A protein has these predicted regions:
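N-terminal accessory segments
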Residues: 1-95
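Conserved Class I S-adenosyl-L-methionine-dependent methyltransferase catalytic core
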Residues: 70-142
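Conserved SAM-binding loop of SAM-dependent methyltransferases across substrates and taxa
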Residues: 157-169
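Conserved SAM-binding loop
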Residues: 186-187
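A short SAM/SAH-binding and catalytic strip from SAM-dependent methyltransferases
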Residues: 210-223
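A short glycine-rich, Lys/Arg-flanked "PGG" loop and its adjoining helix->strand segment in the class I
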Residues: 224-236
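Conserved beta-strand signature within the Rossmann-like core of class I S-adenosyl-L-methionine
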Residues: 237-245
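Short, glycine-/aromatic-enriched active-site segment of Class I SAM-dependent methyltransferases
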Residues: 245-262
Length: 306
């Protein structure tokens, strides 16, 4: 994970500086590992391991990738409690993990935490300073410009649309989400965009220049079908901006996202393999930190892709 610091510095310099610098950022990321190890031990000791639960699966795969637990789930490596970072956004990142920790990892693993509480935490994360600057830095790394017709899958409360419209002037912006209540909230949060309550891109029409898959793939129950339908809506030469937390990145953050209604848990390579079945990889920005980030394009030719 830390081997990617040079690439992160290149594309996410604002994010690093806002966190207080490289050393402060590393302290913050160390907390994500520490909390993940803590939550796993609590779940393991309570006999609450069920790998069918995305939250539990995310912890298991992340910690296995770091050789911190055995195949049977038994912890094999202790993690020293990190030093608290001093940077504002780095501290905010740690506090997010603390908020989730207060819910109780075992209760989350057993589905004993009210879903509304988890949804509220997710909404809070979208408005945190570290998350806002991270997403804005990612869009700049994609060299996004004005004038695009934009599609956002699983738009939830509209916070990504709000961020996008702060910096860009799209020709149009359409978000879709299966939850009508969230669509109503999104219309208030980002009045400059349009939102519709549908469960899939397969129910939509139109043509788009850009699709924002920023922390989205974990929600999709049937990703190949959804990507097929997204592909039909994307103009030839249109681009997908993909930012996907994965088991090779920040384990605590991935676990938090996975606890909030996730359908899938991916490695970065699984994300790439999935997307290249339907689209062409134009540029990989980063593999793991703070997420897998890449730009994909719909080929202009009509040839059938394998």
């Amino acid at each position: 994970m830390y081997l990617e610091f040079p690439a992160v510095w290149r594309y996410f310099r604002d994010y690093i500086e806002a966190s207080g610098g490289i050393l402060e950022l590393k302290k913050a990321l160390d907390w994500s590992v520490w909390y993940a190890a803590k939550w796993w031990r609590e779940i393991y000791d309570a006999g609450a391991v069920n790998l069918k639960k995305p939250f539990v699966k995310a912890l298991y795969l992340s910690l296995r990738a770091k050789n911190m637990i055995g195949e049977d789930g038994r912890p094999v490596k202790e993690v020293k409690k990190p030093e608290l970072p001093k940077g504002l956004y780095a501290r905010e990142w740690v506090e997010m993990h603390q908020q989730f920790d207060e819910l109780g990892a075992v209760k989350v693993a057993r589905d004993e935490v009210d879903r509304n509480v988890l949804d509220l935490l997710f909404s809070d994360i979208q408005t945190m300073g570290w998350h806002r600057i991270m997403v804005k830095a990612f869009l700049r790394a994609c060299e996004e410009t004005d004038g695009h017709a934009v599609l956002e899958p699983y738009s939830r409360e509209g916070h990504l649309a709000q961020l996008y419209i702060e910096d860009y002037k799209p020709e149009s912006y359409l978000g879709y989400d299966p939850n009508p209540s969230l669509v109503e909230v999104a219309r208030q949060v980002a009045p400059g965009a349009v939102f519709t309550p549908v469960s899939s891109a397969c129910q939509l029409s139109g043509q788009f220049d850009v699709v924002l898959l920023v922390e989205k793939l974990q929600w999709v129950a049937d990703p190949l079908r959804e990507l097929d339908c997204i592909g039909r809506l994307l103009k030839p030469g249109g681009r997908l901006y993909v930012a996907q937390p994965n088991v090779d990145s920040m384990p605590g953050y991935l676990a938090i996202l996975s606890a909030i209604g996730a359908q899938q848990v991916y490695t970065w390579k699984e994300v790439e393999n999935l997307l290249t079945l339907r689209f062409k990889l134009e540029k990989r920005l980063i593999k793991t930190m703070p997420f897998y980030g890449a730009i994909y394009v719909k080929p202009r030719s009509a040839e059938v892709r394998r």
